Amino acid sequence: LVGTVYGSAMLVAETLCDHLQADGHVCQIFDDAALTDIDASRVLLIVTATTGQGDIPPNLQSFASALADRAPYMKGWRYALIAMGDSSYEHFCGAGRSLDALLQELAAEPLVVHLEIDATVEDEPEVAALAWLKTWENRL
């Protein structure tokens, strides 16, 4: 599941999906998903940029709103999350942090501590994301 504004989060998601498929996993990228599109029996990997004042990107807003409004009980759901942002802004990685908190509040289980990628440090966020994925991929 990808929340993107300028394409960096999509590049990260595509890199991770390519790697997972090469390792024999089934992977599908959603950039405009509804809550009903997500199969709760599979691991949900979220890659999201942060926009504005720590906001969720527009293409991920409906998914996040559905989570917040419907507050479904998500016990049994497993997920991993990458939050992307720029640490020179006050609400660094705000979108990812808020989604992570919401998912945990709804009883979803994080497979790993979320990754925060800082655009002021990482010139190639997909490289950092791939290294992170490799540390926990064996849990899939």
Predicted regions and their residues:
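FMN-binding flavodoxin-like domain, especially the glycine-rich phosphate-binding loop
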Residues: 2, 6-14, 18-30, 40-44, ...
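Short, solvent-exposed loop/turn elements at beta->coil junctions and helix N-caps
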Residues: 32-35
